[in-house]
Swiss-Prot record:
Keywords: Cytoplasm, Methyltransferase, rRNA processing, S-adenosyl-L-methionine, Transferase. It comes from Shewanella halifaxensis (strain HAW-EB4). This is Ribosomal RNA small subunit methyltransferase C. Monomer. The keyword Nucleus does not apply.
Length: 341
């Protein structure tokens, strides 16, 4: 099923008739494949690994699919479609990337939900694009059109980093935060409680939902002997984590994973401030699977150490898969679950 934004794009598919099309930041549906009924060829770049995996089975000669923060080549396209990001700070990066891959006077299509900030696009679009105009407005979404009128500045990925020092219970670390990756430029409450109650870990440890690498850097600061692996579903987060660990002189294996599906082998420890916070049924289901999969991926005696919003129903699932529930610290917002398999 197509998202609302994709449905509005599809009803405007004649905009890409017989063209080469790049779709940036595509969503969890099959829109890139659907565009092939009109476009000559389609290339998709997903920044969300789950979205990439959903589309991957449909890859073909005229439908190329990539995951990451940029394309592996300098190919140019007649049209670039940008899904306006939920993290608004990511938008300028996507516009610059779109310009890099557009032919001169190439067409830019931007789609987004009204509640997601798309209405402010005319104020946000860089001057190397023409002033955008509204092509469609339906299903609580807007489609804007523009055209590339000048070459965009050539920017490296490092130009999009916010670099700052962060005090943790394990000492000061350097954080390299790319646009679009969650950051408060200070320890968020949940991570602070997690690190204040950091146990001695051993062997091979997995940092699930690593984000910009705050937990990873603090953990290696205190326990550099660990073999650490860091996973996330977001391409910008994975790159941020890599920059953060490099800045602190640490090494870890960093890779994309949809849940724990791509994590290979067993771990002696799993640590996380898991990104499941809203309490919706779908989110609760993902959190439940995370606990179940963590238990399956831990060695005997392995440690499961996470922080979670205290209102989320982790206890029953942890008891089911670990045999007991060990809350080692808590406050009025968060609980630390620290269970041995």
């Amino acid at each position: 099923m197509l998202t609302n934004a994709s449905q509005v794009l599809l009803r405007n598919r004649d905009l890409v008739k017989d063209q080469s099309v790049l779709v940036l930041n595509y969503e969890g549906d099959h829109l890139p494949k659907e565009l092939l009924n009109t476009a000559r060829s389609v290339c998709g770049l997903a920044l969300d690994y789950h979205h990439h995996l959903m589309m991957q089975p449909y890859a073909a000669a005229n439908l190329t699919l990539h995951f990451g923060h940029q394309l592996p080549n300098d190919e140019s396209f007649d049209t670039v479609i940008v899904y306006f990001p939920k993290a608004k700070a990511l938008a300028p990066y996507l516009f610059n990337l779109a310009a890099k891959h557009l032919k001169p006077q190439g067409q830019l299509i931007v789609v987004g939900e009204n509640k997601g900030g798309i209405k402010s696009l005319p104020k946000q679009l860089p001057s190397y694009f023409d002033k955008p105009f509204k092509a469609d407005n339906a299903r609580h979404c807007i489609v804007f059109l523009s055209e590339l009128n000048a070459a965009a500045p050539t920017l490296k990925l490092t130009d999009w980093i916010s670099r700052y020092q962060l005090d943790t219970p394990q000492g000061q670390v350097t954080i390299c935060n790319l646009v679009g990756v969650f950051s408060e430029k200070k320890l968020d409450e949940g991570t602070k409680l997690l690190l204040e109650n950091l146990p001695k870990m051993r062997g091979k440890v997995l940092d699930f939902g690593c984000g910009a690498g705050v937990i990873a850097a603090a953990l290696l600061k205190a326990q550099p002997e660990l073999t650490l692996e860091c996973v996330d579903i977001n391409a910008m987060a994975l790159a941020s984590c890599e920059f953060t660990l490099q800045a602190n002189g640490f090494n870890a294996k960093i890779f994309a994973s949809d849940g724990l599906a791509q994590a290979a082998g067993r771990y002696d420890g799993i640590i996380s401030n898991p990104p499941f916070h809203d309490g919706l049924a779908s989110t609760t289901n993902i959190a439940t699977n995370f606990v179940k999969d963590s238990a399956a991926n831990l060695t005997t005696g392995g440690l499961f150490h996470i922080v979670a919003n205290r209102h989320l129903p982790y206890s029953d699932t942890i008891a089911e898969h670990f045999g007991s529930v060990d809350v080692t610290a808590e406050n009025n917002k968060y609980k630390i679950y620290s269970n041995v398999k």
